[in-house]
Amino acid sequence: MSSSLHIESIGQGQELVILHGWGVNSSVFTPLHASLSEYRVHYVDLPGFGHSDPIDGDLDDWVDAIINQLPNTAIWIGWSLGGLVATKAALRYPEQVRGLVTIASSPCFMAREDESWPGIPPQVLSQFSTQLQQNIGKTIERFLAIQVMGSATAKEDIKQLKELVLSRPLPKNSALAQGLKMLENIDLRAQLPQIEQPWLRVWGRLDGLVPRRVPPLMPNHQAHFTDLLLPKASHAPFLSHRDEFLTGLTDWLNKF
C-alpha cells in the first residue's frame, strides 16, 4: 500500500533524516534549518501527522513506509517517539541507516515497576488516551507543556512549540492513538546491543518524560555509542538549548 508522506528536503551535503515526536510535526525543527544547511536534511511528517497521510499498522509498518521514500544511506535522527522509529529503522535496515541519533528518547517509554525501569507512569498515558476522544487540541497542548517542564525557558519554549506545531494541520486521531500505543507498548531494550551503527544519544537532565535514571541503564560498552547529556535541558533540548545541541550534533556528524 502506497501512502503519501510529507517530506521537506533542504540543503546540500551528507544525507540526514529527522523525525519528530508525538502530537507535533516536522515544523518543530524549523529553528534548525539554517544551522543544518550544509547537510541534505529530510524533515519527515510521521504518518498521520502534519501533512502526511495516516498508515495503518504498527511501528514496523511506519518504518517500512518511511524508508521507502528516503535515500538509501542516511543518518537518522529521531526525537522522542521519532527516536523509537529511527531506532527500529536502524535495527531493520542496517545497510540503509548509516548512523543513529536519538534525542530525549527511550527504548521503553512506559515505566515498568516490576523491572525498576523508569519512564512515564501508565496512568498518564491512559489519561491522554481518554482525553484524545474529548478534545484533541487540549490534549496536545497539555502534552507540549509536559515536554518543556523543568526548562528555565519553559514559557518561551511552549510558545515557540505551539506556534510551530499549529502552522500545520492537527494530527489525525488514528495517528495519535497509534503513537500513544507505541509509547505504551514498544520495548526495544533487548535489541539495542544489535545496533551496529554509530549512535549518538542526546539527553536532557531535567526531562519529565525520559527520566535521568534512563541513560545509566542503557547499553554503553560499545565504542560506537556516544552520550550527550545537557544538564539544564528538559524534553526538547534542540529548542531550549539549541546552540549546545547543535554543537554536540555537528561535532559527532563531522566524524563520519
Swiss-Prot record:
Which residues of this UniProt protein bind substrate? 22, 80-81, 143-147, 235
What taxonomic classification does the UniProt entry list for its organism?
Bacteria, Pseudomonadati, Pseudomonadota, Gammaproteobacteria, Alteromonadales
Q: What is this protein called?
A: Pimeloyl-[acyl-carrier protein] methyl ester esterase
Question: Which proteins does it associate with, and in what oligomeric form?
Answer: Monomer.
EC no. given is 3.1.1.85
Question: Which GO cellular component term is one of those annotated?
Answer: cytoplasm
Domain AB hydrolase-1 stretches: 16-240
Briefly, what is this protein's role?
The physiological role of BioH is to remove the methyl group introduced by BioC when the pimeloyl moiety is complete. It allows to synthesize pimeloyl-ACP via the fatty acid synthetic pathway through the hydrolysis of the ester bonds of pimeloyl-ACP esters.
Pathway field: Cofactor biosynthesis; biotin biosynthesis
Where is it localised? Cytoplasm
